[in-house]
């Protein structure tokens, strides 16, 4: 009988430790308040910082509290073109400039926005990775809905009251540059999650993995495996509907 394979060990679980020691904090929009719903509020970018484990830089924006005599620092995901000392306007009546936060209903069609809320007040959920953005396709004022195109190409209908930041998330093209060295991959995943390095099953011995063994590296049997297989057999293409290359291109539905 073979050894317990990797996915069985993972499934057994362990004490979880999050890799968040060097992180700056949760990157969110301001809490939706009266000032943003009916007018605008002004903040200033104090600092642009690197966030460990994240591809995009963060901007620390200071707003004056609308109710108390104090300043509040918010952490935004920095957009391309945002700089320290820049004024950030957030609200329904804010101007259409890069870095400003507006409800989607106040933004013209064809505008590029990022860190968009899925539901009004959730403080940002869509298009948050480096170089990502959402395109406004159209508005339906009768139903107070806005149609957007997500970074995946999918179309989505969300409330026109959901907010977004004008512009593209900074750090675009980051993935075009190869890591080149194992050391860089080591440091990258040290701050993300315990998923590196990954040994291929065909590189193992037969005792360690269903694909292991042989005089040269090959799987040696069909890599599709049934959904009802026991856990030690579940390696490869589990319950695959189809395998092989996709023929032709798949268009996203309008």
From Swiss-Prot:
SUPFAM superfamilies: Nucleic acid-binding proteins, Translation proteins SH3-like domain
Gene Ontology biological process terms in this record: cytoplasmic translation
Gene3D superfamilies associated with the record: 2.30.30.30, Nucleic acid-binding proteins (2.40.50.140), Ribosomal protein L2, domain 3 (4.10.950.10)
Coiled-coil regions listed in the entry: none
Pfam families: Ribosomal_L2, Ribosomal_L2_C
PROSITE patterns for this protein: RIBOSOMAL_L2
InterPro entries: NA-bd_OB-fold, Rib_uL2_dom2, Ribosomal_uL2, Ribosomal_uL2_C, Ribosomal_uL2_CS, Ribosomal_uL2_dom3, Ribosomal_uL2_RNA-bd_dom, Translation_prot_SH3-like_sf
Gene Ontology MF, one: structural constituent of ribosome
GO cellular component: cytosolic large ribosomal subunit
Keywords: Ribonucleoprotein, Ribosomal protein, RNA-binding, rRNA-binding
UniProt similarity note: Belongs to the universal ribosomal protein uL2 family.
Matches recorded under PANTHER family: LARGE RIBOSOMAL SUBUNIT PROTEIN UL2, RIBOSOMAL PROTEIN L2
Entry protein name: Large ribosomal subunit protein uL2
């Amino acid at each position: 009988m073979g050894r317990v394979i990797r996915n069985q060990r993972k499934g057994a679980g362990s004490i979880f430790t999050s890799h968040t020691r060097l992180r700056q904090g949760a990157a969110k929009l301001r809490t939706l308040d009266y000032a943003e719903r009916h007018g605008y509020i002004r903040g200033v970018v104090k600092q642009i910082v690197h966030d460990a484990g994240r591809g995009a830089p963060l901007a620390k924006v200071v707003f004056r509290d609308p109710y108390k005599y104090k300043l509040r620092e918010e952490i935004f995901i920095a957009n391309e073109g945002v700089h320290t000392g820049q004024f950030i306007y957030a609200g329904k009546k804010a101007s259409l400039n890069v870095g400003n936060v507006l409800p989607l209903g106040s933004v013209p069609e064809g505008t590029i926005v990022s860190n968009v809320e899925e539901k009004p007040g959730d403080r940002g959920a869509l298009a948050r990775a480096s170089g990502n953005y959402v395109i406004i396709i159209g508005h339906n004022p009768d139903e107070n809905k806005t149609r957007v195109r997500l970074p995946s190409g999918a179309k989505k209908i969300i409330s026109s009251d959901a907010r977004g930041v004008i512009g593209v998330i900074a750090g675009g093209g980051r993935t075009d540059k190869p890591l080149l060295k194992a050391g860089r991959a080591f440091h990258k995943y040290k701050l993300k999650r315990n998923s590196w390095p990954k040994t291929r099953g065909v590189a193992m011995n037969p005792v360690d993995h269903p694909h292991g063994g042989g005089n040269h590296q090959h799987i040696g049997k069909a890599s599709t495996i049934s959904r009802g297989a026991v856990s030690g057999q579940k390696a490869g293409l589990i319950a695959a509907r189809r395998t092989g290359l996709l023929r032709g291109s798949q268009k996203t539905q309008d």
